[in-house]
């Protein structure tokens, strides 16, 4: 198990069944549910989409290392990220949830000021091994 897991705009539930996701999809300029689900189905092959290997939210979270999770508040995946953060809290799993306010899918990969702020936070986490 890695000591620290960094998740940037992750698909946490490959079924995309969270009804809140449809609301956020309308604001997400990059990620649509139907196209995403199609790609996830190709990637999954014979693995069911609700299997923890495809939908980590369905797996056993105990024993995971520290988790840093960032997701834009304007992306389709935001509702599941919030739900996942609550699940981690309920199980007392150390994590840091970094919402990218008014930002889009995989925002830390784009040359915008918020990217630099996230990378500075990430560097601090890696260097100090603190949340």
Residue map of PLM features:
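Alpha/beta-hydrolase superfamily serine-hydrolase fold, recognizing
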Residues: 1-131
């Amino acid at each position: 198990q890695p000591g620290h897991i960094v998740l940037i705009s992750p698909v946490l539930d490959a079924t995309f069944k969270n009804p809140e996701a449809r609301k956020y999809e309308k604001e997400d300029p990059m990620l649509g549910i139907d196209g995403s689900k199609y790609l996830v189905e190709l990637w999954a092959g014979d693995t069911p989409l609700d299997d923890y290997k495809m939908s980590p939210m369905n797996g056993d979270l105990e024993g995971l290392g520290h988790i840093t999770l960032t997701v834009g508040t304007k992306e389709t995946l935001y509702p599941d990220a919030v739900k996942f953060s609550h699940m981690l809290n309920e199980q007392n799993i150390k994590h840091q949830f970094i919402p990218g306010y008014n930002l889009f899918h995989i925002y830390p990969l784009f040359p915008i000021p918020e990217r630099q702020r996230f990378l500075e936070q990430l560097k601090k986490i890696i260097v100090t091994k603190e949340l």
